[in-house]
Amino acid sequence: SSRTIEKNCKRDINYMYLLEGRKAPDHAAIARFRSKHFAKCARHFMAQMTKFLIKLEQVTTTEVFIDGTKIESAANRYTFVWRKAVTKHQARFLQKTALLVGDIIQRQELKPLWQKQVKKKHVKKILKKLRAKANEESLEFVSGRGHIKTQLQRDIEALEAALEKLKEYEKKLHICADRGSYAKTDPDATFMHMKDDHMLNGQLKPAYNLQHAVNSGFIVAAGIFPNPTDVMTLKPFLNQMEDDLSFAFERIVCDAGYESEENLSFLRAKGIEAYIKPANYEQIGTKKFAKEIGRKENMRYDKEQDCYLCHNGKEIKRSGSRRVKTASGYIREETQYACSECGGCPYKEKCMSGKNWKKPLEERYKKLTVSRLFEELREEEYRRINSEEGKKLRMNRSIQAEGGFADIKGDSGFTRFLCKGNENVFAEYILYAMAHNLGWLHSRIQNDKLDLHLYELKEDETEAA
């Protein structure tokens, strides 16, 4: 914190050496510099440091390891605003407002200005007419004990209160944007599930999704996102990196949290080799997975007939196709398959087990939904990550990308932001990232590892992988 830095500048000989005899800065000056000056150019400084490390041949432009973590906001933990709750209360309040406006129109003998639903603009127009009427009648607004308000004054005050409430709902929804929640004391923070759940009740806390890219142990880029999951952060983060560094890395290595058809097709279109572990990679080799006969992965696919053969040898034929729009706006083409010979099948219970069925077992028929493009991209990923190079890159991702977070969160104790707002928390992390890079460069010099970019697989690790 800024107060700790101020105290160290006065008491720590290392800080005094860096000051070179100058007066120790005030904590307010440090905080002002961080939020008002450094925050505006933090991305530029991070990019310049990365370019300098490339010039020193400490960072390569071939591969980059990406990982994300959630860091708690400085906001109070119970200052939540939920988008669904606001939307529900807004709709309920609009119904009450419609009744209020209807009564006022009858009393004041005005013409209705809406057709189906009362909106904020209608309340404004009626309020304007009532104020004009009050001016014509030279109405004196009164308040307090011993004063009796006229009906016109009461109607005007009721509409003003309703208008303020509608504005409050609109403001909350505007702050939420496409998020599901925000914190009152830090509107840029979003409520997310955190790993450190001390209450063991799945408590949500205001936090930021922090993404960083690592190469040769150095943090080369970072980004702050409101998404609780990593899958929707990859595209904007890579675009941000390309804008800042003026080039794109040749290979991207991520964990299973980034796998989606949108991300894989995006990387293919940009000519970037993706080493992203499929989400079902750990399950697909287990005995339990192999025994689940209802999964399409355990069925034989006939490419010529475009159908699947189930465990009983029946054909699950193509029944149609559809276009599905995801939350990010990406349109996915899906092919639907259905079997018409499920009656009396001895494997029906195992094939169509599950709790989400609305029909009884006797009336069920096997259906499959498949994205051909995603299946093709996933097969490509399997080939890449199971190659010798893929195993090596996966090992380096766990060492380098997660190691960077281990150094900053574990060793430095950085688990909660001190600042508020996207720009300020990003600047705060960039300071940590730059400090990490300087410390890592010093460590490489001291240990004579300036040429180390990738760790090599050991023989036993190769066999295990």
Language-model features: locations:
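Anion-binding and metal-coordination hotspots
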Residues: 1-11, 20-465
